[in-house]
């Protein structure tokens, strides 16, 4: 009898969580007073098209695979350890984009980020030509083998553990370059460096 009561109580406390898209009405359940949308560890698979977030957007540890077209984040984006693999052109993020441990393989042209971009521990393979980062750029422990020619980084560059062994002909790093043990065999003929190189 005691087992049956324990089984009934246990079944009543178990919640059935299934992955689903996030709609405009459910968003209200995850917004705080500052306009931050907090979805960390939530069972959502997608975000609505044209979503505008007044504050920060946190999709860490979610099954969301792509950001919606027309997304505007007036704060920062936190997508660490999520299934995020695609960021469409036209996405605007006023703050930083921290995507450590996500599934990003390429970064398209036309994505605007106002701060650092952290792509550490992602399967990143390519960055667009003329890529500009308004803060630091980290590609630590990625399979990325080359940086695009003409890349401009307003902060520091971190490449330790990546596949990068050569630098493009022209590049600008206004902060420091942290090699993290990588050996660079080809250096730019035109390098604008604001700081130092740390091996």
Cite the ranges covered by each PLM segment.
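Leucine-rich solenoid repeat scaffolds
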Residues: 158-199
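Canonical leucine-rich repeat
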Residues: 45-47, 65-67, 85-87, 107, ...
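Mid-chain, structured segments of secreted extracytoplasmic proteins
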Residues: 57-103
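N-terminal capping/linker segments that flank leucine-rich repeat
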Residues: 2-57, 191-194, 199
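Residues marking helix boundaries in flexible regions
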Residues: 5-10, 15, 94, 105, ...
């Amino acid at each position: 009898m005691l087992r049956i009561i324990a089984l009934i109580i246990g079944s009543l406390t178990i919640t059935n969580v299934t992955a689903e898209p996030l709609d405009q009405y459910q968003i209200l359940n995850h917004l705080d007073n500052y306009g931050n949308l907090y979805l960390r560890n939530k069972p959502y698979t997608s975000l609505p098209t044209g979503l505008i977030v007044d504050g920060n957007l946190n999709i860490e540890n979610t099954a969301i695979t792509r950001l919606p077209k027309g997304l505007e984040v007036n704060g920062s984006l936190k997508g660490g350890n999520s299934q995020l693999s695609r960021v469409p052109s036209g996405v605007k993020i006023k703050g930083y984009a921290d995507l450590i441990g996500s599934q990003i393989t390429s970064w398209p042209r036309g994505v605007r980020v106002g701060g650092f971009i952290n792509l550490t521990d992602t399967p990143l393979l390519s960055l667009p030509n003329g890529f500009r980062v308004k803060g630091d750029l980290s590609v630590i422990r990625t399979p990325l083998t080359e940086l695009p020619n003409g890349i401009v980084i307003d902060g520091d560059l971190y490449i330790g553990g990546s596949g990068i062994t050569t630098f493009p002909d022209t590049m600008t790093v206004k902060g420091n370059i942290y090699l993290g043990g990588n050996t660079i065999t080809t250096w730019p003929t035109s390098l604008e460096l604001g700081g130092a190189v740390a091996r």
